Amino acid sequence: MHLVIISGATRPQTKSNTAKIISAFRKGYEEIGNQTEVWYLSDRSQWESAAKAFEENENILIALPLYVENIPGILLEFLSGLKPKTTPGTKLSFLLQDGFPEACQSRCCEAYLEMLPGQLGCTYGGTLIKGDLFGLGLTGEKQREKLLAPFTDMGRYFAKTGRFEKDAVSRFAGPEYMPEKQIKMFNRFGRPVQRIFMGRISKKLGCSERLDAKPYEAFVK
């Protein structure tokens, strides 16, 4: 089975967490002889080819990061230029990733994605949701492989089922809400560790001041 994958991430492929997830997913999907083609909307030179692939194929997966509780603007712009299909048979599925540990943070976007295929003349193939992936591109290789391994498994699953069944993706998404006890533990012990971790990341990115610095405070009345 041939699968067209369209990445709706705004970051270039080399810097994109979504691209890393797509790579892991493809590995599992292609194990039994399936084929995939991937188009990255961060590269606008690929838009015409991506639109043509959408038009000519019947098995499509859009992978995207969560942006302000919904889809990235670059993906919305691309979708607005597509012509709805007039011939039935195309299945449109989604892979939604974000940095929040609770699956509930993605439900608003999921609701939008559920109605989107109908507007494009397609049937809905389900949405695979996974959060707590903010540090995916910042971890070491071994930890990154550990985080990506479940996506390879879901690639195998998708190759067999052809869609994301609700029960399977609900288990994959993780906790809908973090337990109160876990939140308290994080506030007590996790935040100091997080500050150290984010401080190291900021230095790698070229920051020379504290993350809580307020350089414009003196100008605010």
Language model region names:
Residues 25-29, 82, 113, 117, ...:
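Hydrophobic, Leu/Ile/Phe/Ala-enriched alpha-helical segments that form helix-helix packing faces
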Residues 38-44, 74-77, 93-101, 126-134, ...:
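Low-complexity, flexible helical/coil segments
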Residues 84-87, 119-122, 160:
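Alpha-helix capping at helix-to-loop junctions
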Residues 96-109, 124, 153-165, 188-208:
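Short flexible/disordered coil segments
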